[in-house]
């Protein structure tokens, strides 16, 4: 069973390809979070968790969801992370720790580069660059699916001292300093479609007088700002004039 969390579609694309090649079921963590349902999942096949890298680990919301969810059947767990560039740091160690604490058998963590979507800090590539990055990522996902199918663990990656730092003490500091929704604003280009509120996996966006209002529980998934059809949402002055990136399928 393949579970995925995705803001703008990178991890959704990865999960969709892996699930197709494994002929396995795909479950949206976004939808589970949105509905707030406590569910039990049973799978006789390995569990695959697909998500973006947030501050050099799996996203906190994904870890919290895994801890709060009941899984039955096959205890083997693989982690596939998408990243906009850079490194996965020491994310594998924290995924292994999560497995040890929740009763899973850790089978490894692997990451693949996908187009940058974090426009609250960086810039999204051009359309042609995005297409090239995705084309390079697809064989990586195929290889990972093959390893899962054969029951092989993902190979361990070497971790530098810097990687241990950014995934370790810097991770909670990054969340504390930067993962906030106070910087989001909306312009008069807003057409009150409500897409941002519908897509927010944490139900953090409400509509007041036809405009989005953020409620203070943001994970910076970029679903709202990148998915806005009129590009009416900005993050401080950082995102102004920047290309949006969104390949999410509803």
Question: In which residue ranges do the predicted regions lie?
Answer:
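FMN-binding flavodoxin-like domain, especially the glycine-rich phosphate-binding loop
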Residues: 2, 6-14, 20-33, 37-51, ...
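Repeat-unit-sized solenoid/scaffold elements
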Residues: 122-125, 149, 175-186, 220
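Generic structural signal for beta-strand residues in well-ordered domains
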Residues: 40-41, 70, 177, 198, ...
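Generic structural motif recognizing short loop/turn segments at the entrances and edges of beta-strands
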Residues: 22-25, 180-182, 210
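Active-site-proximal loop/hinge segments that shape catalytic or ion-binding/gating pockets
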Residues: 245-249
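Iron-sulfur cluster-binding cysteine motifs and their immediate structural context
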Residues: 185-186, 191, 195-219, 223-240
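A mid-sequence, solvent-exposed acidic-amphipathic segment
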Residues: 160-192, 198
């Amino acid at each position: 069973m393949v579970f995925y969390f995705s803001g703008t579609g990178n991890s959704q694309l990865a999960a969709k390809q892996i699930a197709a090649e494994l002929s396995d079921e795909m479950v949206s963590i976004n939808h589970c979070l949105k509905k707030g349902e406590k569910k039990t999942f049973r799978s006789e096949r390995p569990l695959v968790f697909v998500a973006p890298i947030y501050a050099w680990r799996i996203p906190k919301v994904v870890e919290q969801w895994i801890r709060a969810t009941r899984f039955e059947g096959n205890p083997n767990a693989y982690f596939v992370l998408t990243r906009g560039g850079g490194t996965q740091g020491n994310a594998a160690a924290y995924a292994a720790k999560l497995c040890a604490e929740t009763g899973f058998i850790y089978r490894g963590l692997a990451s693949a580069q996908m187009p940058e979507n974090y426009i609250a800090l960086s810039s999204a590539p051009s359309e042609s660059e995005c297409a090239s990055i995705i084309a390079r990522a697809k064989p990586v996902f195929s290889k990972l699916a093959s390893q899962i199918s054969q029951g092989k663990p993902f190979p361990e990656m070497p971790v530098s001292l810097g990687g241990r730092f950014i995934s370790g003490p810097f991770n909670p500091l990054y969340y504390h300093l930067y993962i906030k929704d106070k910087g989001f604003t909306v312009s008069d280009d807003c057409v009150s479609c409500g897409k941002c509120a519908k897509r927010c996996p944490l139900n953090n966006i409400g509509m007041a007088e036809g405009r989005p209002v953020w409620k203070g529980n943001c994970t910076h998934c970029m679903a709202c700002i990148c998915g806005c059809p009129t590009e009416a949402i900005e993050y401080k002055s950082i995102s102004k004039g920047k290309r949006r990136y969104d390949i999410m399928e509803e």
